[in-house]
Amino acid sequence: MVTSTGTLPSLLLGTLLTFTSGALGANPGLVVRITDQGLEYVAQEELLALQSKLHKVTLPDFNGDVRIKHFGSVDYRFHSLNIQSCKLLGSALKLLPNQGLHFSISDSFIQVTGDWKVRKRILRLDGSFDVKVKGITISVNLLLDSEPSGRPKVAVSSCSSHIRDVEVHISGDLGWLLNLFHNQIESRFRRVLESKICEIIEDSVTSELQPYLQTLPVTTEIDHLAGLDYSLMGAPQATAQMLDVMFKGEIFSRDDRFPVAFLAPVMNLPEEHSRMVYFAISDYAFNTASLVYHKAGFLNFTITDDVIPPDSSIRQNTKSFRAFVPRIARLYPNTNLELQGAVISAPCLNFSPGNLSTAAQMEIEAFVLLPNSVKEPVFRLSVATNVSAMLTFNTSKITGFLEPGKIQVELKESKVGRFNVELLEALLNYYLLNNFYPKVNDKLAEGFPLPLLRKIQLYDPILQIHKDFLFLGTNVRYLRV
């Protein structure tokens, strides 16, 4: 009878219905799918939440009159109505194709107590009453749409209620007399309650749920460099079996948001129904993240002597590099070296069935550090490597880990003559494995956050890798505490 912004459907709608318009292309970077199983769980939780909320509902007073033989017309008023107990025995939340959601409650019971007053000219009488309302049935259709601002709009498109039976017992002075006309009073009580049920529901959606949805953010912070845009690209798509909600799913720079030059791919989602909720995350989300961190210089690195282990026989100076570049020690005796590396372009993560991979192309330039603090370039290298990736799906985010392949080094330019590329490959492999990749993996371990609100917990996760996207399935638990 009453919805509340604290109940699971409100939280679920808040998670799913966060609209903005104007994305590049028509394809989302993230899709959330709710199955029948998920909707059944929502209906069960809503029933428990409503049962708790009903005890706090203020029912309206109502009045009327009855004609009593020898007394004439008697005006009565029922007030101070309180719900003493309620049993909501059945509920269902179903999809309305191309519209939204249908929520129903059936075969429910409420017991109400309160006070009554009777007025007949100078006659003033009062007492208490007890009402048992049986066989309550409520049917509500929710229309899901969007505002011009891009945020969600939820409205009650239809509402109906029916009460099978009302039993009124009146006590107090002349209560026995009013009980003689309980049929009239019960009929009046039924009509008032049936009209108020839908009024309360519509008011709750309009004054509580809709304003709540308007306050929902459409972006979230990942770290000081990046944020996630999980605004929706259109109205949720309801079919008879599932509800698909399309998010933009773009990682953006928090300092300087720039347009992305590529589009999200089409995701052909499998027909899976064993979990309550599924998340389909395209390579668009991960590759926009790669753009952000590449542009911020996060993938750049510098190798100096202080990052070489103290017990290493190879130091970052011209004496040690004599094995790679024989002339360098003669041209710059006892001089420290610095290697500056940068990934040429943002690595692109490739999804294929059961496999994740990427390729990185780096450029490394070496400088000798002269006594006057001048850095003089001496050689330039091109470095290529293939990397496999592993992903883990936990209760709130996706984390990653890179497993690097062997690097390939090519000499692009040398100002110090002949070069032993193979030996330098071994040195660079050591550094990348022990410094560069651990830094990247630490960042990947922080994870890609899923668009969840507080009190929503995921469990029994599964992860599948398909062409161009990840497909994650999970069950949902609403935490009451």
Curated annotation (Swiss-Prot):
* Matches recorded under SUPFAM superfamilies: Bactericidal permeability-increasing protein, BPI (SSF55394)
Q: Which CDD domains did the record assign?
A: BPI1 (cd00025), BPI2 (cd00026)
Among its keywords, does the record have S-adenosyl-L-methionine?
A: no
Leader sequence segment: 1-25
Pfam families, sorted: LBP_BPI_CETP, LBP_BPI_CETP_C
Annotated GO molecular function terms are: lipopolysaccharide binding
Disulfide pattern: C159-C198
Give the main localization category.
Answer: secreted
Q: Name one GO cellular component term.
A: membrane
The biological process GO terms on file are: acute-phase response; cellular response to lipopolysaccharide; defense response to Gram-negative bacterium; defense response to Gram-positive bacterium; innate immune response; lipid transport; lipopolysaccharide-mediated signaling pathway; macrophage activation involved in immune response
Which keywords annotate this record?
Answer: Antibiotic, Antimicrobial, Disulfide bond, Glycoprotein, Immunity, Innate immunity, Lipid transport, Membrane, Secreted, Signal, Transport
Q: SMART domains, alphabetically?
A: BPI1 (SM00328), BPI2 (SM00329)
Where is carbohydrate linked to this protein? N300, N355, N386, N394
List where in the cell it is found.
Answer: Secreted; Cytoplasmic granule membrane
Q: Does the keyword Isomerase apply?
A: no
What this chain does, per the entry, is described as: Plays a role in the innate immune response. Binds to the lipid A moiety of bacterial lipopolysaccharides (LPS), a glycolipid present in the outer membrane of all Gram-negative bacteria. Acts as an affinity enhancer for CD14, facilitating its association with LPS. Promotes the release of cytokines in response to bacterial lipopolysaccharide.
What does the record note on quaternary structure? When bound to LPS, interacts (via C-terminus) with soluble and membrane-bound CD14.
- What family is reported? Belongs to the BPI/LBP/Plunc superfamily. BPI/LBP family.
Protein name (database record):
Lipopolysaccharide-binding protein
GN (gene name): LBP
